[in-house]
């Protein structure tokens, strides 16, 4: 029985990245032996165990043979005669197929260390094409390590395209699609996840609403980048620079979905995209099972971003109507991420990335003024029933007028 540290922990240590989780592979053992040593069984599809003290995962070395469709269509063999090299061979990328012995020796049969030096994401073997999830995983790693200079090997991109053409991606569950997408949101360059899926053809299958944006023009006066898909990638990048919050980053990526269904006869104008986008976001979130907090923020950004961009032109009562729809009186924490998404939208335009966005400060000032008007003051003044609501609105409008010097 031999135990090796494998996968992400070895890779990240070689990249001088803090190691958060450790995974281990056990060669030459059985489930019975692991159980007798106090390890707890947790794997349903293949033998995985939790260490009795550290609770880290220990998996028996295994091979996998394609026996069906999708990422679950595999038959596993995890007997004591499976070698470490055979276990590493089934892994997706060479940088994830390096093991470390307890004496520190690195076992690297597929040249993962060289690919780390070369900053290359490369498949281990042609068996890569047997698992459709790997297309999304490689896209996520491309996003995660983009800031370090990693790119996808040409041969690996070709295999990703083969996987897409095979139809296997249609067997991915909503949960796995969202899991990879959500993980990509935490990277420094989440836009690379989307652009990689676009390049290999997977975006049209797993996220068709986003794919539909590419090739759709916008007015060059406001969008020098013209293409709605390119704009979306730029907004995703700007959102990542502005906020670490994942729902904010998600909302920025999907805020313009309505542009993908604008009739060609109306191009490059998209006057109704804030309304048509609502339905598309709901459909996307239902299908991919996006959490409600992500969904709710995305819907608010989609509905209101065009009006927020027009902050300098808005009447005081329009500010109050928007605040009412956002329900920021009860949920004031909503306003900041909505405005950050709008700022990212504004900055996500070719050559205009550093242009100031005073609309954000104007909305913040309007809300600060309006929320100073308290219900108890209106009630104390003798108003009752519907009168309270009407007077509250009236006072809030006046407060915004005074603060923003609106005539």
Curated annotation (Swiss-Prot):
Protein name from the UniProt record: Multifunctional CCA protein
NCBIfam families with a match to the protein in the record: PRK10885.1 (NF008137)
Keywords recorded for this protein, A-Z: ATP-binding, Hydrolase, Magnesium, Metal-binding, Multifunctional enzyme, Nickel, Nucleotide-binding, Nucleotidyltransferase, RNA repair, RNA-binding, Transferase, tRNA processing
Residues spanning the membrane: none
Biological processes annotated in GO: RNA repair; tRNA 3'-terminal CCA addition
Enzyme Commission code: 2.7.7.72, 3.1.3.-, 3.1.4.-
Cofactor binding annotation: Magnesium is required for nucleotidyltransferase activity.
UniProt-listed Pfam families: HD, PolyA_pol, PolyA_pol_RNAbd
Obligatory cofactor(s): Mg(2+); Ni(2+)
UniProt miscellaneous comment: A single active site specifically recognizes both ATP and CTP and is responsible for their addition.
List of residues binding Mg(2+): 21, 23
Function field: Catalyzes the addition and repair of the essential 3'-terminal CCA sequence in tRNAs without using a nucleic acid template. Adds these three nucleotides in the order of C, C, and A to the tRNA nucleotide-73, using CTP and ATP as substrates and producing inorganic pyrophosphate. tRNA 3'-terminal CCA addition is required both for tRNA processing and repair. Also involved in tRNA surveillance by mediating tandem CCA addition to generate a CCACCA at the 3' terminus of unstable tRNAs. While stable tRNAs receive only 3'-terminal CCA, unstable tRNAs are marked with CCACCA and rapidly degraded.
Record has Lipid metabolism as a keyword: no
CDD domains attached to this UniProt entry: HDc, NT_ClassII-CCAase
SUPFAM superfamilies, A to Z: Nucleotidyltransferase, Poly A polymerase C-terminal region-like
């Amino acid at each position: 029985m031999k135990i090796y540290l494998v996968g992400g922990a070895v890779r990240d240590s070689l990249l001088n990245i803090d190691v958060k989780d450790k995974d281990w592979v056990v060669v030459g053992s059985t489930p019975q032996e692991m159980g007798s040593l106090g390890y707890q069984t947790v794997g349903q599809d293949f033998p995985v165990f939790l260490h009795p003290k550290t609770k880290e995962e220990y998996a028996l070395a295994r091979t996998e043979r394609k026996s069906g469709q999708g990422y679950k269509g595999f038959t596993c063999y995890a007997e004591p005669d499976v070698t470490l090299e055979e276990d590493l061979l089934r892994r997706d990328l060479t940088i994830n197929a390096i093991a470390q012995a307890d004496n520190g020796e690195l076992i690297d049969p597929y040249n993962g260390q060289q690919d780390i030096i070369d900053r290359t994401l490369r498949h281990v073997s042609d068996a890569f094409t047997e698992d459709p999830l790997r297309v999304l995983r490689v896209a996520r790693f491309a996003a995660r390590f983009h800031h370090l200079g990693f790119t996808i090997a040409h041969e690996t991109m070709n295999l990703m395209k083969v996987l897409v053409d095979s139809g296997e991606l249609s067997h991915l569950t909503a949960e796995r699609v969202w899991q990879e997408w959500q993980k990509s949101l935490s990277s420094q360059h989440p836009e690379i996840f989307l652009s990689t899926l676009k390049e290999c053809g997977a975006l049209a299958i797993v996220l068709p609403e986003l794919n539909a944006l590419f090739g759709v023009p916008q007015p060059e006066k406001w969008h020098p980048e013209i293409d709605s898909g390119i704009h979306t990638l730029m907004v995703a990048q700007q959102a990542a620079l502005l906020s670490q919050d994942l729902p904010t980053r998600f909302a920025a990526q999907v805020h313009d979905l309505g542009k993908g269904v604008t009739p060609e006869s109306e191009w490059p104008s998209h006057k109704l995209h804030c309304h048509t986008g609502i339905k598309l976001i709901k459909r996307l979130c239902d299908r991919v099972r996006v959490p409600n907090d992500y969904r709710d923020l995305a819907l608010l950004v989609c509905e209101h971003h065009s009006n927020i961009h027009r902050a300098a032109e808005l009447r005081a009562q329009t500010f109050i109507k928007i605040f009412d729809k956002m329900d920021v009186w009860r949920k004031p924490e909503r306003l900041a991420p909505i405005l950050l998404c709008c700022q990212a939208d504004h900055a996500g335009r070719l050559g205009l990335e550093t242009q100031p966005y005073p609309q954000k400060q104007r909305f913040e000032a309007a809300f600060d003024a309006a929320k100073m008007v308290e219900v108890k003051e209106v009630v104390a003044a003798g108003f009752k029933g519907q009168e309270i609501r009407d007077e509250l609105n009236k006072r809030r409008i006046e407060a915004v007028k005074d603060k923003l010097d609106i005539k």
